[in-house]
């Protein structure tokens, strides 16, 4: 990547060209695989060799775990266009679901694993300061030999007492025993990231292996029980379901077809 001296009033132009914002450095940058020539007015004049080296880097497609279930199932062609040509549908879930995820994580993260389910071995949930906010796999290859990376933000990561690991993803949804299978590629993708860790902007994803438990914790809205002023108590039914088996080979097949 190449960091840029992009002023605030030109950030939209930079973003439209494919520039990305690094929150830690508080600077815009040209991601690997994006031609830096269009960004030259924000690059120091003595960086000519760096620009040439950067432009030789092949673009690596990054796939989010959630896209491998939801986005492909909804519109395969849209998924292809977004990853291959950068054409986005901007069909994102409402922000309220992200807020629900944060509230749910905050409630469970300091609890014992048995608080969620007796099916889970004894262990603890890794805290926010033990994991990067966003995690990335190392460079992986599909069945056609094409490079890709998996990049995402997990909900709950478990370290069991025997130093094996688990991942739980939150879903606000109708409870079903089939939910883990419905989100199987997302769950397997998170496990694959931790077992084949890479880095984002020099921040390394830790190696957590083996991952032995993959599960969905479902929240099904039931009723409002009490109201106090402009606040109310919303009751949810909970459903916990595990993915029966790891499906790494099927994940690679899925990426290849995508």
Residue ranges and their predicted role:
Residues 1-50:
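Accessory DNA-engaging acidic/polar modules
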Residues 176-184:
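Active-site metal-coordination segments of metallo-dependent hydrolases
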Residues 47-162:
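Metal-dependent nuclease catalytic cores that hydrolyze phosphodiester bonds in DNA/RNA
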Residues 184-195:
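An active-site-proximal "capping" alpha-helix that borders the catalytic cofactor pocket
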Residues 152-176, 190:
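Conserved catalytic cores of phosphodiester-cleaving nucleases, focusing on short active-site segments
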Residues 91-94, 177, 207-209:
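Catalytic phosphate/metal-binding cores of nucleic-acid and nucleotide-processing enzymes, i.e., regions
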Residues 147-151, 164-165, 229-238:
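Short, mixed charged/polar active-site loops
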Residues 52-65, 197-258:
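Metal-dependent nuclease catalytic regions and adjoining charged, substrate-binding loops involved
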């Amino acid at each position: 990547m190449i960091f840029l001296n992009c002023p605030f009033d030109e950030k939209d132009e930079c973003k439209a060209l494919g520039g990305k914002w690094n929150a830690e450095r508080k600077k815009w940058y040209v991601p690997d695989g994006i031609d830096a020539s269009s960004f030259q007015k924000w690059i120091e004049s003595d960086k000519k060799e760096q620009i040439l080296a950067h432009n030789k880097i092949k673009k690596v497609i990054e796939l989010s775990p959630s896209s491998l279930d939801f986005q492909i199932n909804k519109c395969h062609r849209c998924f292809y266009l977004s990853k291959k040509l950068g054409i986005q549908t901007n069909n994102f879930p409402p922000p309220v679901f992200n807020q629900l995820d944060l509230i749910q994580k905050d409630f469970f993260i300091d609890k014992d694993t048995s608080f969620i389910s007796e099916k889970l071995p004894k262990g603890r949930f890794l805290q926010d300061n033990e994991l990067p906010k966003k995690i990335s796999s190392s460079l992986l290859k599909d069945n056609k030999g094409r490079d890709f990376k998996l990049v995402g933000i997990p909900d709950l990561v478990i370290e069991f007492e025997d130093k094996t690991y688990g991942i739980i993803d939150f879903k606000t949804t109708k409870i079903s025993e089939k939910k883990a299978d419905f989100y199987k590629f997302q769950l397997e993708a998170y496990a694959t990231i931790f077992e084949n860790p890479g880095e984002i902007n020099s921040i390394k994803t830790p190696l957590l292996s083996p991952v032995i438990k993959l599960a969905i914790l479902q929240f099904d809205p039931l009723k409002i029980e009490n109201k106090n002023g402009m606040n109310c108590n919303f009751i949810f039914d909970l459903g916990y379901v595990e993915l029966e088996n790891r499906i790494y080979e099927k994940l690679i097949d899925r990426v290849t077809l995508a």
